[in-house]
């Protein structure tokens, strides 16, 4: 049960506070990505990969950034399907999801490629676009709220409460 958090502004202190409040969601580490447009944070609970492989926020080769909590059930099948295009450096499904989101539209990835339980936030730096997503059943929660300056989001509702 990882934790993902963010705000659509440069404000690392708010995300540090949320990470601290929700630290039990990920005892294997936490980290933050911050730009002028977005600040993303992550608490890591490593289950299927080594803790150093799953460190997030995950920055892709295209400079896009992903924070993710979940499991891709068809991970091994997708490794075979994309073996001529995707060359993983880890055993972490975060790396695969990041690559897929770099290559295909969000809708294509969610509707036609992955079979998963998830919540994630993907920041496309080039397009200056942020996508928030959770599985249709809400197994991996993602809460959000409007603020005076944008949107704040968290794996737990208490991350949104001051």
Question: Across the structure, where does each feature detected by a protein language model lie?
Answer:
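Cysteine-centered catalytic environments shared across enzyme families
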Residues: 1-162
């Amino acid at each position: 049960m990882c934790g993902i958090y963010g705000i659509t502004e440069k404000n690392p202190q708010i995300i540090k506070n949320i990470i601290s409040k929700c630290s039990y969601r990920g005892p294997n580490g936490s980290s933050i990505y911050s730009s002028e447009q977005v600040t993303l944070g992550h608490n890591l609970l490593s289950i299927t990969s080594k803790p150093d492989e799953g460190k997030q926020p995950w920055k892709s080769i295209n400079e896009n950034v992903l924070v993710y909590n979940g499991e891709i059930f068809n991970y091994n099948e997708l490794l075979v399907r994309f073996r001529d295009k995707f060359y993983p450096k880890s055993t972490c499904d975060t790396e695969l999801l990041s690559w897929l989101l770099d290559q295909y539209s969000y809708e294509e990835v969610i509707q036609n490629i992955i079979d998963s339980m998830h919540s994630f936030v993907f920041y496309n730096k080039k397009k200056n676009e942020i996508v928030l997503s959770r599985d249709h059943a809400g197994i991996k929660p993602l809460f959000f709220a409007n603020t005076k300056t944008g949107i704040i989001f968290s794996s737990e509702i208490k991350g949104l409460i001051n």
